[in-house]
Amino acid sequence: MMVLAAAAMAGSVSLAMAQAAPATQTATPPAQTPQTTTTPATSDLPDAPSTSANVKAPAVPTGPTAVIDTSMGRITCQLYDKLAPIAAANFEGLADGSKDWIDATTQKKIHGQPFYNGTTFHRVIPGFMIQGGDRLGTGMGDAGYYFNNETDPSLTFDVPGRLAMANAGLGPNGTGTNGSQFFITEAPQPSLDGGYTIFGQCDEHSVLIVASIARVDRDSNDKPNTPVTINRIYILRNGDKPPAEPAASPATDHLVVHPGTTAPPQ
């Protein structure tokens, strides 16, 4: 099953809390005779480090914009085509039909047909993420191929709205298991850093939609009881204007005005 191997996954992987080791007591060093020192000249002193030296500059997405029209509203994300070129190009190709894929049911090669249209978010967890990209809707489907992770130290799960590839860890030959499934985070998830390829960033309004989808009624496997459908994904390039947003299904009972940032249930 294509899952997120993270602490937030209800009913699967529990959080392994790191416990600090007790401090080791050491003997007090013997007293030493103080030595006379001279104050160095100002010109010999090193430059004071900048107060911003350790501040990480945020990664800026520079690629196309993915407009994901769902049955509960529109999600808009810009892709990191420079930091995750393989994942970004893969998502673009599956979304607009320019990339071939294998039908998981018939095992036939599909050409020129968008992969994601009509699929659902098959796994949703409040405070954590929503997961989609499986035409089977079971968490077991893919596009008939896999590729390795693309991780960059400047791109972490430190903010809400990260668009990332779902995977099942390493394959039997030590290769990656990224394919078609993806997820979008509702809140920062540092426990996922380094294990999943981030290839896009969704805007603030989209995070509200993600939070609303994450709170629909769902079963014990976190699958929505009423399907939340991806109607279509548009890839906008070179200043393309987004199409008019279609009317979404009523979801006022689940609308989240301020998404929570609590840790996912264990």
Go through the PLM ranges and name each one:
Residues 2, 15-266:
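Cyclophilin-like peptidyl-prolyl cis-trans isomerases
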Residues 1-7:
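NTP-dependent nucleotidyl-transfer catalytic core
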